[in-house]
Amino acid sequence: MEWKTCSFCEGKIEPGCGKKYVKKDGSVMQFCSSKCEKNFKLGRVGRKLKWTNMFKRMNKGQ
C-alpha cells in the first residue's frame, strides 16, 4: 500500500484513512483530516495557513 498526500496541507495519509472529495468538474481531492476538508470548503488556501506543510515548505528560508 502506498501513502497518499493531502490536497490541502500536503500531509501524509495512511492507507485506509482520510476522506475523498470529488468536485463537480470530476477532480478528486484527498484530505487527511476534517480540519483540512472544512478549510478547503470555506475557500481557504493551504499556502497561507501557518500550520500546513505547504506553508512551511514555501517559507523555509525566511
From Swiss-Prot:
Keywords: Metal-binding, Ribonucleoprotein, Ribosomal protein, RNA-binding, rRNA-binding, Zinc, Zinc-finger
Binding-site residues for Zn(2+), renumbered to this chain: 6, 9, 32, 36
CDD domains in the record: Ribosomal_L24e_L24 (cd00472)
Cofactor: Zn(2+)
Molecular function in Gene Ontology: rRNA binding; structural constituent of ribosome; zinc ion binding
Quaternary structure and partners: Part of the 50S ribosomal subunit. Forms a cluster with proteins L3 and L14.
UniProt-recorded name of the protein: Large ribosomal subunit protein eL24
Organism the protein comes from: Methanococcus vannielii (strain ATCC 35089 / DSM 1224 / JCM 13029 / OCM 148 / SB)
The gene coding this protein: rpl24e
